[in-house]
Curated annotation (Swiss-Prot):
Coiled coil: none annotated. Homodimer or heterodimer. FMN binds at residues 34, 196, 249, 341. One of its GO terms (cellular component) is cytosol. One of its GO terms (molecular function) is FMN binding. It comes from Schizosaccharomyces pombe (strain 972 / ATCC 24843). This is Putative NADPH dehydrogenase C5H10.10. Substrate binds at residues 196, 199, 368. Its cofactor is FMN. Its EC number is 1.6.99.1. Gene3D superfamilies: Aldolase class I.
C-alpha cells in the first residue's frame, strides 16, 4: 500500500485539535478500560502496563485515558486495580507516563471511587479484615447493596458492601482524590486527570439519588444537594492542578439507579460545571450502546449530542463506535471519539481507521485476565503500519 501522510484527510476525525493544554494530531482517543493487569496490592505491573501503553501511543499526537485508579485506600476494594496514593505507586507509574510522552502522545489518568464495595476474598487477609472492622474501608452513602441489588464485580466475584458515608467521610474522599490528582500530574508527569461520574459508582450514586435520603442532609434530597459532592470534589481538584488538566466523564444513559430524573440531573451537572469551570479540558460522555442489559444501537433521538450542545467544546463521545460512526460524530464541532475494545485489539488503531484497514477482533475472554500479557500486549500491528516504520 502506498501510504500517504497520516493526517491528510477531509474527515475531521483525522485532523488536529487542541484539548486543554494539548495539541492533538487527530481526534481518536484511547478510552479508559479496566484490565486488572496489576498486583493484588494495587501496585501496577510497570513493565507489562508500560508495554501496553507504549504500543497504543504508537501514533504521535494521540490522547490516552488510562484505566481507572483508586485514589485512596478507602476508594475501593477490588483486587488487581491500580492505585495512586503513595510514593511507591507514583514510582511505578512514572515510566508508563514517560513511555507515552516519548512517543509524543498525551495521557490523562482517570480516578474512580466504588460505592462501598469490597471483594469477599479481599477480606480473607487478616490485616485488611481488621481495617474493615475499624471502618478503614471503601464507603457508601447508604450501606445498601451494590447496584441493581447484585453484589458482584466485573469478574463475577462476590462483593461485601459496607458503611454509611458521613460528611467527614465525604471531605476525606475529596482530600484523597485531590492528592491523587496532584500525584498524577506533578509526581507521575501526566498531562491531566479524568474525574469519573459513571455507571452507578460513588459520584454517580450521589448525583442520581442512588441512596434516597440515607445520607448527610447536605448531600441528599434536592438535585443541588446531590450534586454538591461532585462539584466540591471538582473544585478541589481544579484548584490543585488547573482546569485545563481536568476532564469529566458521565454515563447519561446508564440505568443503574433507575433515577427518573437522570436527564435533568445530567443537564444540571453539565450546566453547573460549565458555569464554574469554563476552561475544563473536556466533557466525556458514554453513548447508550453498551450497558448491563445488552446492546443498544445509537439513534438520532438517543445519543450524547444533546449533552455536547449543552457543554460546547471540547467533547469526547465513547461507546461502541466503529469507523463510520466515528467519522460521523467527529463532524460535530470540536468532537473527539474514544475507543476501548478496538484500541485494545488494535494498538495502531488511528492508523487503521485512517486507511480503512481491517481491524483485529478482540478476545472478550481475556479482558479481565489478571496480571496476564495474553489479550493485552499480544495483539498485532498491521503490516502496513510496520512497513512505514521500516521506511523511517
Amino acid at each position: 500500500m502506498a501510504v500517504q501522510k497520516l493526517y491528510e484527510s477531509q474527515s475531521k476525525l483525522f485532523q488536529p485539535i487542541k484539548v486543554g493544554n494539548m495539541q492533538l494530531q487527530h481526534r481518536m482517543v484511547h478510552a479508559p478500560a479496566t484490565r486488572l493487569r496489576c498486583l493484588d496490592n494495587g501496585l501496577v505491573m510497570t513493565d507489562l502496563v508500560k508495554e501496553y501503553y507504549k504500543q497504543r501511543s504508537s501514533i504521535p499526537g494521540t490522547l490516552l485515558i488510562t484505566e481507572s485508579l483508586f485514589s485512596g485506600a478507602k476508594s475501593g476494594g477490588f483486587s488487581n486495580i491500580p492505585c495512586l496514593y503513595n510514593d511507591e505507586h507514583v514510582e511505578a507509574w512514572k515510566p508508563i507516563v514517560q513511555a507515552i510522552h516519548d512517543n509524543d502522545c498525551f495521557v490523562f489518568i482517570q480516578f474512580w471511587n466504588l460505592p462501598g464495595e469490597l471483594k469477599v476474598d479481599y477480606l480473607e487477609d487478616q490485616e485488611r479484615l481488621e481495617k474493615v472492622t475499624q471502618g478503614e474501608c471503601p464507603m457508601d452513602p447508604t450501606g445498601l447493596p451494590a447496584a441493581l441489588g447484585s453484589a458482584y464485580s466485573i469478574c463475577g466475584e462476590e462483593l461485601y458492601v459496607d458503611k454509611f458515608m458521613t460528611k467527614q467521610d465525604i471531605q476525606e474522599h475529596i482530600t484523597t482524590y485531590t492528592e491523587a490528582a496532584k500525584r498524577a500530574v506533578f509526581g507521575c508527569g501526566a498531562d491531566g486527570v479524568e474525574v469519573h461520574q459513571v455507571n452507578g459508582f460513588l459520584l454517580d450514586k450521589f448525583v442520581l439519588n442512588g441512596y434516597g435520603d440515607k445520607c448527610d442532609p447536605e448531600y441528599c434530597g434536592s438535585l443541588e444537594n446531590r450534586a454538591r459532592f461532585c462539584l466540591e470534589l471538582l473544585e478541589s481538584v481544579v484548584n490543585a492542578i488547573g482546569q485545563e488538566r481536568v476532564g469529566y466523564r458521565i454515563s447519561p444513559f446508564s440505568d443503574i439507579w433507575k433515577d427518573k430524573d437522570s436527564f435533568e440531573a445530567h443537564v444540571f451537572m453539565i450546566k453547573k460545571i460549565k458555569e464554574r469551570f469554563p476552561n475544563l479540558a473536556y466533557l466525556h460522555a458514554i453513548e447508550p450502546r453498551q450497558y448491563w442489559n445488552g446492546h443498544v444501537h445509537i439513534t438520532q433521538e438517543k445519543n450524547t449530542l444533546i449533552y455536547k450542545n449543552l457543554w460546547g467544546d471540547p467533547f469526547i463521545t465513547a461507546g461502541g463506535h466503529d469507523r463510520d460512526s466515528a467519522i460521523q460524530m467527529a463532524e460535530q464541532e470540536n468532537t473527539l471519539v474514544a475507543f476501548g475494545r478496538y484500541f485494545l485489539s488494535n494498538p495502531d488503531l488511528p492508523f487503521r481507521l485512517k486507511y480503512n484497514l481491517p481491524l483485529n477482533k478482540w478476545d472478550r475472554a481475556t479482558f479481565y485476565t489478571k496480571m496476564s500479557p495474553k489479550g493485552y500486549i499480544d495483539y498485532p500491528f498491521s503490516k502496513e503500519f510496520l512497513d512505514t516504520k521500516k521506511v523511517e
